[in-house]
Amino acid sequence: MKQRIIIIGGMGPQASLELHRRMIQQALADGAKYGADFPHIVHLSLPVPDFIANESRRSEALEIIINELKDIAASMDDVIIIACNTAHLLQPDIEQRLNIRITSMVDAAIDYVSRHYKTIRLLASPTTIHTGLYDKPLKAAGVTVLTPDKDEEQALEVIIRAVISDQAIPQSVLDKIPTTTQYEQANAVSYINNCPSSPPVLLGCTELSCAFAEKPNTIDPINILLRYLTIKGVL
């Protein structure tokens, strides 16, 4: 029996669906042909209240996640993943309450970035930025982290909400993110050749992984996590 992968998703659902889709794509790339070749995935797409925008609902969100994990008897034998970067703020409480271990996408990204880069630019939700979820450990590892200004933060929030609701992202909003606009206007080869010193962009929100998938000079925690799981033999 394959090791069970549990995706704690729904925050938002488009992003956790993208993580699930890429897991299946990874299995196909590794030669999966029949049903039994694919990973055993339990995807909990949970209608969790928006505790990211409303901190007062954090306890309510935590209880929903814990109760769902109890219902499926989550244990140390499972590979448990939180599909939302910001929701990793709940990781210590979940692990302590249920005596389980979560395979952290955030930790995997921090480890990768700290080994490969001296400076990065962080694009993420305002909560991820303000809590230092990425900033603090990366800076402690000697990485310079460039964070969005206020206008960029507001634009990122609009982009994240658009992905969650499956709406088109207005070009006027994209134009407020200079780095992504630059990527959009140049192909990968010319951008890398002409701007080799530009710091790479860490997509510190899975909605941004959806919005800017495969853009040049980006670091995608979803892909880092998939490589980690592949190396560990989980996928």
Task: Please annotate each region the language model reported.
Residues 1-235:
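Non-catalytic structural scaffold of enzyme domains
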